Amino acid sequence: MILSFFALFFALYLAKTLEKKLIYQQVRSKIKRQINFKFHSLPIHYSYCFSIWALLLLILLYLAGVNGFLILFISLVASFIIFFAIYRFRDKFNAKNHLDWLFKKSLLLSATIGILITIAIMMAIFGEAGKFFKIIAWQEFFFGTKWNPQLAMNGGQEVVKSSFGAVPVFLGTLLITLVAMSVAVPIGIMGAVNLSLYCKSSTRDLLKPILEILAGIPTVVYGYFAVIFIAPFFKLFFGLLNIEIASESALSAGFVMGIMIIPFILSLTDDAINSVPRSLYDGALAMGSTNYEMISRVIIPSAMPAIIGSIILAVSRAVGETMIVVMSAGLLAKMTFNPLDSTTTATAQIVSLLSGDQEFSSSKTLASFALALTLFVVTFIFNILALIVIKKYQKKNG
């Protein structure tokens, strides 16, 4: 610890010495060029500040029981940084350019890290999915109509390779997503229109934060809501109509998922509508348009790119949802498009396949990566198509 303090005081000494040298150089430059030059802040000021913060860090490390050699290393690094920083305070030093360079490099580093993480995820998914397709033919996976990986294992031996047909899983994912979007999209868009154009500002300021808070509720809470309230309600309602409905149905899961998604669409659509220029409102009303004509023919088309973006976000959330499906729709894959039947989704099956003590190299476990790969590709294609649609609307609206 004593050596660490010595390193910091040595840094202060270097800063003070360099400060005197630099001031002398600047005075000479001032005399030669007859200009009024002055430091924005003296180098010793930066060294004092840096040393104080470094000393605080060293004290915290010492109290935390960190090894003394590590503390000494940090002190020496701090001294080097101070020395380098003070050395860079030259006559022609331009802090603005250096900060701009540092900012650009930071942005480049952040973008590179994001790209590398994405590539790493893709490599992991593609690699493990490739192992799965070496065991199970891709034709069987993408076109098979029987999904029951539990039957494919018997004492660790693969016995039934025809149990990995993923069509029922993808069909269930599509069904629940459609139910959720049929609930969330109309309510979200109409609620945003009402919130933006008809509500008072005080009412809007009260309701919008509440709706945004709903978006942060854990999905397991929505799952309990579906199991305890929505599923029994649908059971009672359809029972009065003499219509049979499963206790774990795609309708209850999709309905609750739609409720969960409403705040996303409503909040983003509200922001999009408020970003439409006021001149378009006034121009439409001046031409004799009714409120309905103004909203349907002027406001909504102008905000359509952002609305499509909110719908894309909602679809991605619906496709990736797991807990609501596991709790209220079950894990049984069926070849059905009836929302009153029980079904499952790809994400729920991924959780099911990765749960337990089975070997990582088994086809049952590797099947989860095949499902993940399919979801990744489908979502990627969907986002590309959505970007094309957004550009089309942007060109159409000028």
Predicted feature residues:
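Transmembrane alpha-helix signature in integral membrane proteins
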Residues: 68-84, 164-194
